[in-house]
Amino acid sequence: MKEVAIIGATGYTGAELLRLLANHEKVNVTYITSRKEAGKHVFKVHPHLKGIEKYKNLCFTGDIDKVDAYLVFTATPHGASMDIVPDFIERGMKVIDLSGDYRFEDLSLYEKYYKIKHKGLPDVKIAYGLPELHREEIKEAQLVANPGCFPTGAILAVAPLVKENIIEERIIFDSKTGVSGAGIKPTETTHFPNVNENINPYKITTHRHTPEIEKELKKLGKAKVSFTPHLAPITRGILTTAHTFLAKDVDREEIIKIYEKFYGSEVFVRIFSEEIPKLTWVRGTNFCDIGGFEIDEHGRLVVISAIDNLVKGASGQAIQNMNIMFGFDEKEGLFDVGLNP
């Protein structure tokens, strides 16, 4: 059994890591950290984990210097990971970072969109943790930068089109997200009366996930990305509508074949040739469902993707990356059916 640690295990992504790892047969969670909750048993903070035999002796610690594991998940805020990750690296541990701190090779982009001065990248192999595009790099990495939730759904929605160079470089993404994507701390924006029966667009041209989407798509081909997110009155999920514009004369059947070939061996990407993906199909799972593939009379090709923002958009993808790094079956601890309805 491999021992793993979770730094920042009180938030939604930390809790989701614990939920998913409870069923993982090849790892044990030996350390969970929180300065605020230090000394408390895990189920005192996460009551839904009470009775899990694997966690019967698991308590929070406030001292990250005591953490010793094969791999560390850092579920910490943007800007905080870069303060602690180098120490874990120096001590020989593998790290999967769920913040945005290591997603950019060009640190000027990080500093521009996150408004944080970066402290530099450690001198180790770093991989962007989207397995469908970077599996070989992930296998060799000591540090994996887990992708953002919006970028995961957006990139997977159009990667085959960009790779095959059948669309114009202009790509427009419209995403609806659940409130859990804003984190565990309530704000005026996420307050129930402001979210309920409402749709709230935000950062309509300046969201920090825009350059992350664009830089990854540019590794496949041409891309100029526009992205607008909307906060929806749901707990989990991201539904992304990708508006692309055909540069070649291809029909719907040819496009579907391109997707089926591109993702043919990917266990967590499901292509729907007829149905339009729905959030309830992926809720609680590590799947990314892709469908739509409709072309209008002006040559606009619309593709829809659906993910659970806390699973494929965060903790599930982190565990998928861990499985790859350790040489486990990628499905280990993750292959579950969606909560529908």
UniProtKB/Swiss-Prot annotation:
Gene3D superfamilies reported in the protein's UniProt record: Dihydrodipicolinate Reductase, domain 2, NAD(P)-binding Rossmann-like Domain
Family matches, as CDD domains: AGPR_1_C (cd23934), AGPR_1_N (cd17895)
EC numbers on record: 1.2.1.38
Gene Ontology molecular-function annotations: N-acetyl-gamma-glutamyl-phosphate reductase activity; NAD binding; NADP+ binding
Coiled coil: none
GO CC annotation terms, alphabetical: cytoplasm
UniProt catalytic activity: N-acetyl-L-glutamate 5-semialdehyde + phosphate + NADP(+) = N-acetyl-L-glutamyl 5-phosphate + NADPH + H(+)
Pathway field: Amino-acid biosynthesis; L-arginine biosynthesis; N(2)-acetyl-L-ornithine from L-glutamate: step 3/4
GO BP term (any one): L-arginine biosynthetic process
Active site: C149
Compartments (UniProt record): Cytoplasm
Keywords: Amino-acid biosynthesis, Arginine biosynthesis, Cytoplasm, NADP, Oxidoreductase
PANTHER family: N-ACETYL-GAMMA-GLUTAMYL-PHOSPHATE REDUCTASE, CHLOROPLASTIC-RELATED, N-ACETYL-GAMMA-GLUTAMYL-PHOSPHATE REDUCTASE, CHLOROPLASTIC-RELATED-RELATED
Role of this protein: Catalyzes the NADPH-dependent reduction of N-acetyl-5-glutamyl phosphate to yield N-acetyl-L-glutamate 5-semialdehyde.
Family in the record: Belongs to the NAGSA dehydrogenase family. Type 1 subfamily.
The protein, known as: N-acetyl-gamma-glutamyl-phosphate reductase
Species, as recorded: Methanocaldococcus jannaschii (strain ATCC 43067 / DSM 2661 / JAL-1 / JCM 10045 / NBRC 100440) (Methanococcus jannaschii)
